[in-house]
Amino acid sequence: MNSALLRISAAFAVALCAAVPVPAAAQHRVGHAAMVYVSKAGAADLYEIQASQMATRRARRPQVRDFAQMLIADHTHSTQMVSEAAHSDGLNPRPPVLERSQRMMLRQLEAARDRDFDRLYLSQQIPAHVQGLALHRAYARRGEGAALRRTAGEIVPVVEHHLARARELAPMR
């Protein structure tokens, strides 16, 4: 009798576990590639924000200061978008951290003479946005996690606009 009761209890417990819905985030877990994307996108945004904050104070040309303000707003927003998408895809990302090359570029900006600042800032923005564009395009095409892929695709036109604007401003002296 005890054996039959145990079997029935075990069968009931298994059925109960199978009936409990699994949260959507747990069903769509993403892996290492997603974390790398989130980390690189966050680092790129952090660099853009910090470099542009410096440009709002040091740039001589008003067009460069306006460009910097746009970058601060847009990259702050994209950081939030990527973080929300990562959470939707079941990740718990760490706060962004600058890469070594980005820290070096910020040090170069800090050390630049006032008359050289605009040129140096814009010369950094072009390759930084080329890299960012490649990152977001690639992830939008082949990345893990539907929310992160969609977000990467939404960020692409913003980065394209930044790159075009940086190229427009760069030849101006």
Question: Where are the regions a protein language model picked out?
Answer:
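His/Met- and acidic-residue-enriched segments that coordinate or traffic transition-metal cofactors
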Residues: 2-10, 19-173
